[in-house]
Each structure stands twice: as C-alpha cells, then as structure tokens.
C-alpha cells in the first residue's frame, strides 16, 4: 500500500511541475499570458463550462460518436477478420485489398469522405469506424489463424461443422487477440472522434468547442477541452486495462 502511494506521488510530480512552469511563463508578459493562460483562468473557465452545461453537452456528443463508431467498427472488424481467418477464399479475395487499404493513413481518406458524404455526422462516424475496423480485423484474423493444433484436432474428433468449429474452438481461443485489438481500437476511436470533430466542425463535440474557442481567442477554453480529452482518454485506458487483466485471468482459468 505504501509503495503504491509513493508511486502515485511520483506520478503527480510531473503534472505539478508542468503546472508551475505554465504559471511562470503566463506571468512573464502579456504575450506569454495569451499563449500560456494563467492556471486560475483555466480553472475558472472549467467551472463556467461545467456550470452552464456546455462541457457536459459537448463531452456527451463526443462520447456518443466514439461509442457508435467503436460499435460499428468492432462488429465489421470481427466479421471480416473471422471470414479471412476461416474461409480461404475470403482471405484470397479480401486479404490483399484489406492490407492495401490499411496502409493508407486515416487522414488520407478525409478528402474523399468529405466529397462523397459531406461534412456531417455520418462522415465523422465513418472515420471513427474505419479507425476501429483496421485493428479489430487484423487481431481477429491473427487470433483465428494462431489457434494451436490440439484445439483444432478436438473439433475434428467431435466432427464439428464450420459454425460449431468457429463458436466452440476458434473464437474462444482467439479472444485474447481480439481483446488486445479492442484495447487498441478504443484508443484509436477516441483520437479519431476528436480529430473528426476538428476536421468536420458540425454539431456539438469537444473538437467543435475547441474550434469555437480558438476563433474567439479563448485559449483558456481550448486548454480545458484538451485536458478533458486527455483525462477521459486516460480513464478509458485504465478501465480497459483492468478489464483486460480480469478477462485474461478468467480465460486462462477456463
């Protein structure tokens, strides 16, 4: 317990030091105060946004978009990855296209998506779904292809059909790979959601709020949004890490 508290204390040292340096530069001159907004002003803006509901409204919009894109990308990724891993014809037909397309940076699709679908909510959700789809499909494929031979022989002994073999043999043994892919996909979804809001500034969202604050020279609001995005991302990473640790322990036990 004591070692954990010491570890937490050391972990807080860097943020405190950065806050001290930030405050130091903000008080050097007016020019520095514009770029490095005093911590007191940032704190005041946080309570202002929290009090009038703007922070909650935009945060919920970003979380909702991330969750929708995560759900769609996960389902499609598992479906495509499983198809390539199980059906050789699907691997031959889909595999080359998938591996070629995933080499294109996500930002490279922005002009095409904007041209085809405009700059609305659908385009933002599509970007998030694409960011999630790639790691989910790859890890599902790798998980199914790396199932050990003894497990496959069990399916042959029981004369499982293709669906039974997938449900009772391949999928249970591929879950660690799939969960690792989901951990990565969750981080990608959050980053892609905020990025899409910055690129397609339509509707509420933390990214849109940052752009509005930037145009109004409200650097304090921009910093509040950045810190909020970082904290939510850390909480997601912490939560999925705990779930992954529990899940892998349960999976090994069963």
List each model region and its residues.
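Glycine-rich helix-loop "coupling/hinge" segments at transmembrane-helix boundaries
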Residues: 115-116, 192-228, 254
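Transmembrane-helix boundary motif in ABC transporter permease subunits
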Residues: 68-98
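Short cytoplasmic-facing helical segments at TM-TM junctions of multi-pass membrane proteins
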Residues: 139, 143-178
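C-terminal transmembrane helix and the adjacent membrane-cytosol boundary/short C-terminal tail
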Residues: 88, 145, 176, 180-183, ...
């Amino acid at each position: 317990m004591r070692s954990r508290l010491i570890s937490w204390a050391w972990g807080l040292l860097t943020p405190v030091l950065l806050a001290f340096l930030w405050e130091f530069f903000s008080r050097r001159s007016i020019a520095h105060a514009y770029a490095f907004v005093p911590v007191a002003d940032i704190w005041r803006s946080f309570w202002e946004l929290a009090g009038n509901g703007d922070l909650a409204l935009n945060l919920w919009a970003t979380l909702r978009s991330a969750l929708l894109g995560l759900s769609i990308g996960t389902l499609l990724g598992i479906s495509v990855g499983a198809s390539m891993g199980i059906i050789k014809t699907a691997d031959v037909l889909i595999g080359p296209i998938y591996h070629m397309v995933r080499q294109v940076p996500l930002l490279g699709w922005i002009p095409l998506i904007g041209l085809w679908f405009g700059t609305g909510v659908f385009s933002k959700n599509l970007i998030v779904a694409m960011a999630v789809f790639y790691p989910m499909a790859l890890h599902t494929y790798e998980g199914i292809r790396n199932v050990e031979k003894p497990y496959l022989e069990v399916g042959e002994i029981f004369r499982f059909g293709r669906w039974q073999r997938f449900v009772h043999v391949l999928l249970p043994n591929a879950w660690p790979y799939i969960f690792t892919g989901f951990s990565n996909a969750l981080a990608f979804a959050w980053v892609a959601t905020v990025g899409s809001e910055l690129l397609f500034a339509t509707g509420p969202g933390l990214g849109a709020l940052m752009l509005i604050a930037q145009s109004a020279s409200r650097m304090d609001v921009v910093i509040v949004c950045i810190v909020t995005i970082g904290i939510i991302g850390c909480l997601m990473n912490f939560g999925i890490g705990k779930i992954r640790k529990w899940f892998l322990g349960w999976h090994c036990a069963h």
